[in-house]
Structure formats: structure tokens, C-alpha cells
Amino acid sequence: MHQSLLCFGARRLPMTTKLGHQYYKGTRTGKMGQKTRHGGFLVQWSRVRTFVPPSGDCELLPFVSRRIQATKGTYPEGANGLDGAVYFDLAHS
């Protein structure tokens, strides 16, 4: 038995750039150039965002203190390596 067509239209999923016939959501990035006749893309460098770092000595500091020691993550392994039971135990601990 086939599902009703109403059920297909009633799904409530977030709209992505891949969904919707003849609907373009986009990613708010803007157009950085134009397509050429032969399928290429011509970049207009005046529209490209550039970030200029400070020149010379800069006294900007990182957000994390330099006194913090870097730690490497360790994961417990079960009898079968990192299986679903290990992840389940990690989530509920």
C-alpha cells in the first residue's frame, strides 16, 4: 500500500541548500565573480573578502593562556576496540 501524497508534503525538516524544487536558499556568501561561456568561473577580486594581519611586532595574545599544558585525548578501548558499548558508557558517565 502506498503512503498518501499528503504525508510526503508534510515533513518538517530544516530547509537546506539541497532541498526544494526551484528554491535556492543559498549560504549568504554572495557572488564572488561570474561564470564564463565555457563553464569556467571568473573571480572578481574586488568582491573577495580579505583579512589583513597586523604588520611587524604585534602584542596580541591568544585566548588560551600559555601556561596551560597541551593534553592529548585518550579513549578507553573495549574488547572490540572503540565499539558502540564503549561510546554508550562514555555518554552515560
Curated annotation (Swiss-Prot):
GO terms for molecular function: structural constituent of ribosome. It comes from the Eukaryota. It is found in: Mitochondrion. Keywords: Mitochondrion, Ribonucleoprotein, Ribosomal protein, Transit peptide. GO terms for cellular component: mitochondrial large ribosomal subunit. Residues 1-13 form a transit peptide. The keyword Ribonucleoprotein applies. Pfam families: MRP-L27. Transmembrane segments: none annotated. The keyword Flavoprotein does not apply. Its main location: mitochondrion. One of its GO terms (biological process) is mitochondrial translation. Component of the mitochondrial ribosome (mitoribosome), a dedicated translation machinery responsible for the synthesis of mitochondrial genome-encoded proteins, including at least some of the essential transmembrane subunits of the mitochondrial respiratory chain. The mitoribosomes are attached to the mitochondrial inner membrane and translation products are cotranslationally integrated into the membrane. Component of the mitochondrial large ribosomal subunit (mt-LSU). Mature yeast 74S mitochondrial ribosomes consist of a small (37S) and a large (54S) subunit. The 37S small subunit contains a 15S ribosomal RNA (15S mt-rRNA) and at least 32 different proteins. The 54S large subunit contains a 21S rRNA (21S mt-rRNA) and at least 45 different proteins. Belongs to the mitochondrion-specific ribosomal protein mL41 family. This is Large ribosomal subunit protein mL41. It comes from Schizosaccharomyces pombe (strain 972 / ATCC 24843). The gene is mrpl27.
